[in-house]
C-alpha cells in the first residue's frame, strides 16, 4: 500500500502526548520525593479520590486494542459489539458489590495476598506467576497495535515506535509511581475521546450525515445486533457477548491486580465504588465511539474495501488508513488520531508495568525479605518497574504473530483471567473450599482454557462461524484486486468442529467454571474447610447481596464463618479506623505460613477492637 506521510503539525501533536505524559511522571517524582515509601509509590498512599481513578480505570483497559480493533471488528462483522454495553454494566456491579469490598477491607496491596490469607503461600505464588505471564503477553499485544498504526500512516519504523512507547511508559512509571500513572491515564483518556469524536464528526459529515451512515450500515447488514442464537461456537451473538463477555471482563475488572490496585488506592471504599461506577460511563462512551467509528468507516468504504482489494494487508490497518484518507488535507488531525491510539496504549502499558512491579515486590521480594527499609523498598520497586518495562516492550515482537489485536487481547485475558476469576470466586464465595481444592481448581481451569485456545490456534474455527459479512470491491478500479474467500481446510479431527471452534469469548467461561467445579469437588474429597477457622472479612457469599433471602439461608451460605451482619453500616461509616485495623490484621496473617490452618478466633493478635470493626459484613 502507499504510505502517506505525517505533516509537521502531525508530529507536533503526537510529540506533545509523549512530552506531557513524561512531564507528569517528572512532576510526581519531584512532588513526592520526601514520601519515599513503597506504599506511596505503589498505591499512592491510599489517598486518591474517585475522579482521576475512574478515568485511569477506563483508559487502562480501553487501549489501542479498542481504538484500532473494535472499529475494524464492527466494519467486518457488524455492530453486535455494542452488546458489550450490557456486559460492562454487569461486570462493574459485580466487581463493586462482590469483589471490591473483600479486597478493600482486607488492607492488601497485592490481590494475591488475599490468597495467602484465605488459603496458603503455594496458592498465592501459583496465581502470581500466572498473572505475570498473562499481563506480559497482553501488554505485548497492546504495545504492538499502535506501533503498527504509526507504521502504516507515516512509514515510521515499526520497532522504533514500539521501543519509544516502552521507554516513555517505563520512564514515568519508574519516576512517579501510581500517582503518575493515574493522572497520566486521566490526561490520556481525554485525548482518546477527543480523537474519536474528531473522526466521528468528520467521517459522518463526509458520508452525508449520521442518518446516512446508519442507512448504509443497515443496507450492508451491519446493524443486525440482536442475534439470539444459543450456539456457543458462533463468534458474536447476544449470548456469547453477554455471558462469555461478562466472564472475560469480570476476570479483567473483578480480580485483576491493575484494577484493584487503583481501587484500593482510594481514600475510602465509597470513593473506590464511585470510581468504578464513573468508570462505567467512560467505558460506555469509548465503546459507542468505537462502534460508530466502525459504522462510519463502512459507509466510507462500502464500495471499495481496502482489505479485500489488497490496498492494506491486515484488518487492524483499516482505521489508520481511513483516518489518513479522511484528514489528508487537514494537517495535525492524523497526528491527533495516532495520539488517540497511543494514549490507550501508554495508559495500559503503564498500568501493567506498575501492577507487575507491585505483585512481584509484595508477593516475592517482601515475603522473602520482610525487614527491608522504606528507602530500599522504594528503590527495588522502581527497579522492578524498569525491568518489566523492558520485558513488556520486548514481548511486542511476538504480538505480530497473533492476528487481529482485539481477538488476541481478549483471548489472552480469557485463557488466564477465567481460571483466576474462578480461583478468587472459590475463596470469596465458597467458605468450605480448602487450599487443595483451590490449587487443583486453578490448574484445571488453566488446562481447560489453554487446551481450547491452543486447539483453536492450530485448527481455526469453520468459516461459517467466523467469516465476515460481505465486503465489496466493485468501485476500486485496481488491477490487483483479490477476492477474499474462506480458506480451504485440510483434514481436521472431529474435536476441531466443536471444542476448538468455541467462541474466543468463552475461553474465560470454560476456565472459570472448570476451576470452580474442580475446586468444589476436590474440597469435598479431601475434607471441607471449617468455617470457624476463616476470618469473616475474607468471605462474601452471594446471599449477602440480597436482603430478601431468609436469615436461615444466609447462615447456611456462610458455612460456619463467625460474623455479625448487623455492624456492616457502622463499618462503612468508620472507614479510616477500619482500614488501619485491616492492615494490622493483614500483617499478622502474612507472617504465618498460612493464616487459615493456624487461625484461632480467641488469639489475642486477632481479638482486638480494630478487628471487631472490620470483620463483619
From Swiss-Prot:
Catalytic activity: (S)-lactate(out) + Na(+)(out) = (S)-lactate(in) + Na(+)(in); nicotinate(out) + Na(+)(out) = nicotinate(in) + Na(+)(in); pyruvate(out) + Na(+)(out) = pyruvate(in) + Na(+)(in); propanoate(out) + Na(+)(out) = propanoate(in) + Na(+)(in)
Physiological role: Acts as an electroneutral and low-affinity sodium (Na(+))-dependent sodium-coupled solute transporter. Catalyzes the transport across the plasma membrane of many monocarboxylates such as lactate, pyruvate, nicotinate, propionate, butyrate and beta-D-hydroxybutyrate. May be responsible for the first step of reabsorption of monocarboxylates from the lumen of the proximal tubule of the kidney and the small intestine. May play also a role in monocarboxylates transport in the retina. Mediates electroneutral uptake of lactate, with a stoichiometry of 2 Na(+) for each lactate.
Full protein name: Sodium-coupled monocarboxylate transporter 2
Xref: PROSITE patterns: NA_SOLUT_SYMP_3
Family indicated by similarity: Belongs to the sodium:solute symporter (SSF) (TC 2.A.21) family.
Transmembrane segments: 6-26, 48-68, 81-101, 129-149, 158-178, 181-201, 236-256, 274-294, 335-357, 386-406, 412-432, 438-458, 508-528
Compartments where found: Apical cell membrane
NCBIfam families in alphabetical order: sss (TIGR00813)
GO molecular function: lactate transmembrane transporter activity; monocarboxylate:sodium symporter activity; symporter activity
Source taxon at top rank: Eukaryota
Amino acid at each position: 500500500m502507499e504510505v502517506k506521510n505525517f505533516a509537521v503539525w502531525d508530529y507536533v501533536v503526537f510529540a506533545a502526548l509523549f512530552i506531557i505524559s513524561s512531564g507528569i511522571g517528572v512532576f510526581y517524582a519531584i512532588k513526592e520525593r520526601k514520601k519515599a515509601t513503597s506504599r506511596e509509590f505503589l498505591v499512592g498512599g491510599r489517598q486518591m479520590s474517585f475522579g482521576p481513578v475512574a478515568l485511569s480505570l477506563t483508559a487502562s483497559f480501553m487501549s489501542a486494542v479498542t481504538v484500532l480493533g473494535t472499529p475494524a471488528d464492527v466494519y467486518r462483522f457488524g455492530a453486535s459489539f455494542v452488546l458489550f454495553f450490557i456486559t460492562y454494566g454487569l461486570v462493574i456491579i459485580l466487581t463493586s458489590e462482590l469483589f471490591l469490598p473483600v479486597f478493600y477491607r482486607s488492607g492488601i496491596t497485592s490481590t494475591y495476598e488475599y490468597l495467602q490469607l484465605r488459603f496458603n503461600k503455594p496458592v498465592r505464588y501459583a496465581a502470581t506467576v500466572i498473572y505475570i505471564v498473562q499481563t506480559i503477553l497482553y501488554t505485548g499485544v497492546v504495545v504492538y497495535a499502535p506501533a503498527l498504526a504509526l507504521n502504516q500512516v507515516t512509514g515510521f519504523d515499526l520497532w522504533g515506535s514500539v521501543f519509544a512507547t516502552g521507554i516513555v511508559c517505563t520512564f514515568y512509571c519508574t519516576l512517579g509511581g501510581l500517582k503518575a500513572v493515574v493522572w497520566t491515564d486521566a490526561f490520556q483518556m481525554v485525548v482518546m475521546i477527543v480523537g474519536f469524536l474528531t473522526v466521528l464528526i468528520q467521517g459522518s459529515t463526509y458520508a452525508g450525515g449520521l442518518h446516512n451512515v446508519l442507512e448504509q450500515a443497515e443496507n450492508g447488514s451491519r446493524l443486525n445486533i440482536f442475534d439470539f442464537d444459543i450456539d456457543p461456537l458462533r463468534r458474536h451473538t447476544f449470548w456469547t457477548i453477554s455471558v462469555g463477555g461478562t466472564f472475560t471482563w469480570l476476570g479483567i475488572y473483578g480480580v485483576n491486580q491493575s484494577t484493584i490496585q487503583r481501587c484500593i488506592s482510594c481514600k475510602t471504599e465509597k470513593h473506590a465504588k464511585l470510581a468504578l461506577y464513573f468508570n462505567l460511563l467512560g467505558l460506555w462512551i469509548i465503546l459507542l465511539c468505537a462502534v460508530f467509528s466502525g459504522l462510519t468507516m463502512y459507509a466510507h468504504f462500502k464500495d471499495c474495501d481496502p482489505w479485500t482489494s489488497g490496498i492494506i494487508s491486515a484488518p487492524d490497518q483499516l482505521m489508520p488508513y481511513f483516518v489518513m484518507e479522511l484528514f489528508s488535507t487537514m494537517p495535525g488531525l492524523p497526528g491527533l488520531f495516532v495520539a488517540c491510539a497511543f494514549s490507550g496504549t501508554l495508559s495500559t502499558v503503564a498500568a501493567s508495568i506498575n501492577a507487575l512491579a507491585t505483585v512481584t515486590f509484595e508477593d516475592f521480594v517482601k515475603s522473602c525479605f520482610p525487614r527491608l527499609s522504606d528507602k530500599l523498598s522504594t528503590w527495588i520497586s522502581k527497579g522492578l518497574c524498569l525491568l518489566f518495562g523492558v520485558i513488556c516492550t520486548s514481548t511486542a515482537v511476538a504480538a505480530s504473530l497473533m492476528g487481529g489485536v482485539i481477538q488476541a487481547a481478549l483471548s489472552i485475558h480469557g485463557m488466564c483471567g477465567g481460571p483466576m476469576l474462578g480461583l478468587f470466586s472459590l475463596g470469596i464465595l465458597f467458605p468450605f473450599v480448602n487450599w487443595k481444592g483451590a490449587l487443583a481448581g486453578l490448574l484445571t481451569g488453566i488446562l481447560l482454557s489453554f487446551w481450547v485456545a491452543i486447539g483453536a490456534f492450530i485448527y481455526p474455527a469453520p468459516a461459517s462461524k467466523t467469516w465476515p459479512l460481505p465486503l465489496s470491491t466493485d468501485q476500486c478500479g485496481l488491477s490487483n484486486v483479490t477476492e477474499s474467500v474462506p480458506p480451504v481446510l485440510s483434514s481436521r479431527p472431529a474435536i476441531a468442529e466443536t471444542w476448538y471452534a468455541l467462541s474466543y469469548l468463552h475461553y474465560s467461561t470454560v476456565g472459570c467454571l472448570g476451576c470452580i467445579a474442580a475446586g468444589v469437588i476436590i474440597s469435598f474429597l479431601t475434607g471441607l474447610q471449617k468455617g470457624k477457622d476463616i476470618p469473616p472479612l475474607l468471605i462474601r457469599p452471594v446471599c449477602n447481596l440480597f436482603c430478601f433471602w431468609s436469615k436461615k439461608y444466609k447462615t447456611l451460605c456462610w458455612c460456619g464463618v463467625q460474623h455479625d451482619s448487623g455492624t456492616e453500616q457502622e463499618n462503612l461509616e468508620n472507614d479510616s479506623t477500619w482500614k488501619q485495623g485491616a492492615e494490622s490484621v493483614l500483617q499478622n496473617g502474612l507472617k504465618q505460613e498460612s493464616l487459615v490452618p493456624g487461625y484461632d478466633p480467641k488469639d489475642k493478635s486477632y481479638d482486638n477492637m480494630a478487628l471487631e470493626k472490620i470483620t463483619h459484613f
